[in-house]
Amino acid sequence: MDIVIPFVESDDDAWLDVFLKAKNLHPKNEKARQIFFVPFRRRYSSHGLFKYWWRALEQNYKSLTKVHLLLMQPSQFPSFLRKDDPRIVAHYHNEFIPDKHRPCFNSSTIELCAIKELDLKGNFILSNDDMYVNAPVDDSCFEQDGKPLAFFESRDAYGVFNQFRKTLTNGHKLVMDHYAKPLPYYHWHHLFQVYNAEFCKAFLNDEWDRISKGLGKWRRDHDYNHMMLMMAQNVAGMSVHSDKFPHKGYFEMPLFTVEQYSNADSFQVVCFNDTDGKHTDLTRKYLSSKYPSKCSFEV
């Protein structure tokens, strides 16, 4: 199965130039340049951990076909990766995001445009760079009888507590309107999501006039995100609920303790959601001890 993953690395000077210009910030020297970027660094840094994503992937997911790497521009291609590896397909934003939404720093816009425009076929996995295949898996963990697997658990309404919940609410309403029927609220799982390319492309094309109004360069309250595709697949009978789908390995790092790293070994897919970077050293220690050797993706 293919994996689609957006990636950004703020240590790339060329990318940072684009970012500061898009923010209408014009530092006069390098010191000012770095100071201007301080409030944004935590969201746009990989904290130097991305190589472990690839090492874990190769060690634990033997049936991988390709990785579709979504990048703003060529300077963002990770220096540790082999550019000639046929399993790595780099897609730059100008290939799939409309001009009016570029430069794009909105992951929802990036993901939805990629799913709609790229030459994806069959079922694929959507990942983030903080999600690791941490124990052996194969395609049977992610699909059954040709349909994507998912874990559905009802919850109360998403509400508008924060921007992410607002985008979930937007997608929930769109899917209800599309199918003209009530739709339960589902727990979201910030881990791998499995989508069927043909179904998702058809759904996005049908609703693109409405969805496109929620696209933009930056995150906004009226965005839509890819989770609406999970909802739509379920309503349409295109996905299969399964307890074996890897959905439990999410770790909210501000609430995480050192002792809990050992728990990560028991999950096939884990997410270390550490956007403020406070646990970077501990996460690196864990990952480097588990995946110390270079993989064949690396130079």
List PLM regions with ranges.
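Short, acidic, metal-binding catalytic loop of nucleotide-sugar glycosyltransferases
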Residues: A56-L64
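A solvent-exposed, charged loop/short amphipathic helix patch at secondary-structure junctions
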Residues: S10-R42, F151-F152
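Extended C-terminal regions of large enzymes
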Residues: G249-V299
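Conserved donor-nucleotide/metal-binding helix-loop-beta segment in metal-dependent transferases, i.e.
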Residues: A135-F164
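Active-site-proximal specificity loops/subdomain of glycosyltransferases
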Residues: R41, S45, Q76-L120
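Catalytic core and acceptor-binding pocket of nucleotide-sugar-dependent glycosyltransferases
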Residues: Q163-S266
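Short catalytic/ligand-binding loop motif for oxyanion handling, primarily in non-cytosolic enzymes
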Residues: D11-W15, S75-F80, Y132-P136, C141-Q144, ...
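Short beta-strand-to-loop acidic/aromatic patch adjacent to the donor-nucleotide binding site
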Residues: K121-N134
